[in-house]
Design a protein with these regions (language model features):
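Short, surface-exposed coil-to-beta transition loops
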Residues: 53-57, 78-82, 102-107, 129-134
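N-terminal glycine/threonine-rich, aromatic-flanked beta-hairpin/loop signature
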Residues: 51-89
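Edge beta-strand at a domain terminus
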Residues: 28, 119-140
Length: 140
């Protein structure tokens, strides 16, 4: 019995020592941050060039696919109208696509200057003319 107790105590002490020596987390595991998370949110879009520059709110929301987002109300087209954008770090690309059901199409790009400002250029084609828009997005 004494031999069993000594064996048990030794085993417990070794276990405590081994598990107490596990490396501590330093909070810097270099795990990749989902690059589109900084884009998601409500933004004020201030058009500075184009046919009729305007200021309005857009929503950038998560989309299916690793680096895709949906942009609601681009070109003040309504929050039910969405343009799909591809995020690559600080760059946003809007491939040519229909914008709503009124025969408009949109394409363009943007660059995130910092976590609260995006500089954008996009083109909206209504079938008869193209509006070349320059805009600044500011995160709300």
């Amino acid at each position: 019995m004494k031999k069993f107790s000594l064996y048990t105590v030794t085993l417990v002490l070794i276990s405590v020592f081994v598990f107490s020596c596990a490396p501590e987390e330093d909070g810097n595991d270099n795990a990749p941050i989902d690059q589109k998370q900084k884009w998601i949110g409500n933004w004020t879009c201030q058009e500075t060039a184009g046919m009729n520059p305007a200021t309005y709110t857009i929503h950038i929301i998560d989309s299916v696919g690793t680096n895709y987002v949906l942009i609601e109300n681009l070109y003040s087209s309504g929050f039910s109208t969405r343009a799909k954008g591809l995020i690559n770090a600080t760059n946003l690309t809007i491939a040519n696509q229909p914008l709503g059901s009124g025969g408009y199409s949109v394409d363009g790009n943007g660059n995130m200057a910092n976590n609260t400002t995006v500089n954008m250029n996009f083109n909206v084609n209504d079938g008869s003319s193209v509006d070349n828009v320059v805009a600044t997005l500011t995160k709300q």
